[in-house]
Amino acid sequence: MSVKDVNDGRIWLDWPEQFRSPSEEFKTQLTQTYAKEIGYYQFLQFLFFTEWKDLKTYANERGIRIIGDIPLFVSMDSADVWANKHLFQLDTTGYPLAVAGVPPDYFSATGQLWGNPLYNWE
């Protein structure tokens, strides 16, 4: 999120090349330059997980189960794709070669185009 903030909230595909595909040296420089901002987001994640754990414990102790859908894909604009491009089917500029979706069925006569990049299983 810190690097996204530096790039005015734009998707990583619209960032300058040095940010889109940073060298290890540039990553180290970013980590040092934006240590305070990175720490802020780490703290927010800590708060969320702490509160989520407390909520789950509270609900479970009262016989309430919190259930949810497990995502099968990640967002194209996620840190996961940005940091691990080799794990996804992307072209040399980072754009997806294909995206996830489903064909027409009884839920949708036209099918659904989800837009998530596909995993590179090889």
Segments (PLM) and residue ranges:
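Alpha-amylase-like alpha-glycosidases and glucanotransferases acting on alpha-linked glucans and related
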Residues: M1-F49, V74-E122
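Flexible, glycine/threonine-enriched loop-and-boundary segments that flank and lead into catalytic domains
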Residues: T50-E61
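Hydrophobic faces of well-ordered beta-strands that scaffold small-molecule active sites
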Residues: I66-G68
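Anionic group-transfer/hydrolysis microenvironments
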Residues: P71
